[in-house]
């Protein structure tokens, strides 16, 4: 069994850790962006969140939806749906001994696709921008899963 120092010498794992940190930081940014838009537009989802703006009917007017808040929230949800599988499959893939350049290509394509997807979602850019970014990132994760299943797992 490999110890932590061996793992830290694994260039593919370290590349994965770097790119995983980037997409996780981006996902954390989306939480902050959602909160920013909720606060600046005074749009809340829960009654207790708008209690500082008054009570009763006065507070109820802040319980509403806003297109900008919903757009950021949907982009964040899309991150959750795509980054979590990338983290799990990417970790297993990085530990399976892939070629460094192939692994880095997978990681870079995924990170680039997710960043571009967020830009396309929040700007908003016309389709097929967002769709292409989504399918590129999804395809990268599928490619890693396929390579992992083909080369290292016994089915």
From Swiss-Prot:
GO terms for cellular component: endoplasmic reticulum; endoplasmic reticulum membrane; membrane; mitochondrial outer membrane; mitochondrion. It is a multi-pass membrane protein. Its EC number is 2.5.1.18. It is an enzyme of class 2 (transferase). Residues 3-9, 97-99, 149-155 are lumenal. Residues 34-62, 124-128 are cytoplasmic. It is found in: Endoplasmic reticulum membrane; Mitochondrion outer membrane. The modification N6-acetyllysine is found at residues 42, 55, 60. One of its GO terms (biological process) is cellular response to lipid hydroperoxide. Keywords: Acetylation, Endoplasmic reticulum, Membrane, Mitochondrion, Mitochondrion outer membrane, Transferase, Transmembrane, Transmembrane helix. GO terms for molecular function: glutathione peroxidase activity; glutathione transferase activity. It catalyses: RX + glutathione = an S-substituted glutathione + a halide anion + H(+). The chain crosses the membrane at residues 10-33, 63-96, 100-123, 129-148. Conjugation of reduced glutathione to a wide number of exogenous and endogenous hydrophobic electrophiles. Belongs to the MAPEG family. Homotrimer; The trimer binds only one molecule of glutathione. This is Microsomal glutathione S-transferase 1.
